Every structure is written in C-alpha cells, then in structure tokens.
A protein has these predicted regions:
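Non-catalytic interface/targeting segments
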Residues: 1-47, 52, 85-101
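Mid-chain, well-packed structural core segment of small domains
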Residues: 49-81
Length: 101
C-alpha cells in the first residue's frame, strides 16, 4: 500500500512531522506492506509520482479532503501522532480516523 503524508521540510524518514496542507513543504510517500514500512520517499508535489496511491493521512479533520476522495484515495486523520514513524505505527494498528462525507 502507498500512503501520502504531507510533511515539514525534514527529509528524515522517521522524524519528519506531519503538516497541514497549506503549510506542507513536501510529501512523504510511504510504501507499507505486510505490517511494516518498506520505503519512504519524498516529493515536492504529488504530481511527481503518477502511480495509484491508496491512502492519504491528514493532520486534522478540518483539512480540505474532498479532492482526495474524488480521486479515489482513502483519507485518514491522525489523532495525536506527529512523526512518520508514529503515523505508520498507528496505521498498522488501525488507530487513525477515517474521514467521510
């Protein structure tokens, strides 16, 4: 599964922090498979990667998420998690909230 996470400008795969969409510096693309992170890559824009992405994780439930849903991407929201490592751990245990209409 591929997961987009909007992050700050740190390129640290474990410690980059999630950012609001209007504050993001780059996108982290996490390849998550069999309960673990296989790889993490960083992109300035989502358009730089043109393959199907399954999920996007947003910083809060007030973010503008409808465009992602219209693209067929499942939208999740963190509770208290901040770093990529914390978010992927919460993803593994289904501890992220699902956004809906």
């Amino acid at each position: 599964m591929l997961i987009w996470i909007p992050v700050d400008d740190s390129m640290d795969k474990k410690h980059s922090k999630i950012a609001k969409l209007f504050e993001l510096k780059q996108w982290a693309l996490v390849n998550f498979d069999a309960g673990e992170v296989k790889s993490t890559r960083f992109f300035k824009t989502r358009e730089e990667f043109d393959e199907w992405v399954d999920f996007i994780v947003l910083e809060n439930k007030y973010e503008a998420y409808m465009d992602f849903m219209n693209e067929g991407i499942m939208v999740l929201c963190v509770r208290e998690e901040k770093t990529i490592e914390e978010i992927t751990e919460a993803f593994k245990f289904k501890e992220l909230d699902e956004m809906g209409f």
